[in-house]
Amino acid sequence: MTIVPVNGTILVQQGNREFNKLYEASFPDTKEGNSAAYAWASSIAMGWEDCQDEDWNRNHAA
């Protein structure tokens, strides 16, 4: 996970090994934003985010 503060926001990059893809999201640079960023990054790493459904279907199509 990479966290970069940018003009009052936190830019987070997290890769997913199964999909071989790097995901990126921005959060407010606050205590709540920091917490949300870590939660998002862990969901991405596990493959549980809704935005990954298309990647899942592409890799695991029946």
From Swiss-Prot:
P22 kil is essential for lytic growth in the absence of abc. Expression of P22 kil causes filamentation and cell death. InterPro entries: Kil_phage_P22-type. This is Protein kil. The gene is kil. Pfam families: DUF5444. It comes from Salmonella phage P22 (Bacteriophage P22).
